[in-house]
Amino acid sequence: MVAPGSFLACRSLEQIKVDVAYSGANVKLIGISSGISYGPLGMSHHSAQDVACVASLPGIEVYVPSDAQQTRRVIRCICQSTAPAYIKVGRSAVEDIYTPQDELSGMTPHGAPPTGVLLVACGEVTQGAVQALRRLQEAGYSAALLDAVSLKPFDQDTLL
């Protein structure tokens, strides 16, 4: 099911909880234009809490891909699974960070393990985090970025 994230995740939460999460139904939900990307349409279209709402439900996987390539890989991955899943995708077109050959990982590292700054990002904001990483490294800081595409299950081993 594809729908604006503000309506899919929040207004339909009770149905998702009962009909998808509790029953373990093989349902894939895609929340488009989530967050505040519908800005001019007002607060009724904002959905900053959609990931938190869906992630609070048992048995549902939650993904927030950073670009079109990663979105394609996430969709292929969840279609091979019978677990319920929610994907949050942004509204804006962003430059690809990944290539079609890159493998999907719950948390993708960029840069060497840092002794200084560690950035963690997901979704559309990863583009800005990549730029921040470059600036930090150019300024001589030891910095790295983890792109957390999988929020549930969360890859805490890579983070730690």
Predicted feature locations:
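A general structural motif
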Residues: 96-106, 118-129, 148-157
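Generic recognition of short, well-ordered alpha-helical segments
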Residues: 11-15, 130-131, 157
